[in-house]
Amino acid sequence: PAIAGQGKYCGIHPSDERCRQAVERRLRADGLPRSLAQVLPHLYGDEEMSAGAWLLAYYVRKHHLRWHALHCWHRGYLDLVRMLKAQGEDILASLELLPTNTLAAHPENRHSEELVRPADGLRIPLGHTAGPDWDAVWAAVREGTIDILGSDHSPHLPACYRPQEPFRSSAGVPGLDWYGHLLLNE
């Protein structure tokens, strides 16, 4: 691909259409609604994201790309990135997290079920179901497997949040206003 010749990093979300279709089939078979609460644990679980990462790793190596490994949340994905870095692959690994993830890892700091935007006091509910493996994540940060800490797309404003339409829900709101201070200080 053209990007390989330019020395740029290629970053692709570690998921594919087969994964999404498998979630759809699972929900139908179990008679469950197509809601974010039902979709996210399956779409962003260790098996799905790690499998997507292995496919990306194959593509990256085949085409001699520099890889920006996004959303390194799960043990299987982290183990893959760690192994490939040890083999000399040029990988920039990032952890895009939410204040909800951070607060879930440190429940002693969680004083509410809402997130408050400091500028105007607007409140939105907390919640994310990706279920990161926090012991593995922070070990990877400390050892240098993860290079970048960033913020994820969420949280969602109530007006943009459509839990019954998970593939049409808004990608979220600007993170700095809502939780930049938490990411930097938590």
Residue ranges of predicted features:
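Residue-level recognition of alpha-helix initiation/capping sites
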Residues: 51, 75, 131-132, 178
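Residues in flexible loops and secondary-structure boundaries
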Residues: 101, 132, 181-184
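Phosphate/diphosphate-binding loops
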Residues: 129-133, 137
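Residue-identity detector for threonine
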Residues: 100-102, 129, 145
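His/Asp/Glu-enriched, well-ordered alpha-helical/loop segment
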Residues: 34-64, 117-121, 139-149, 153-186
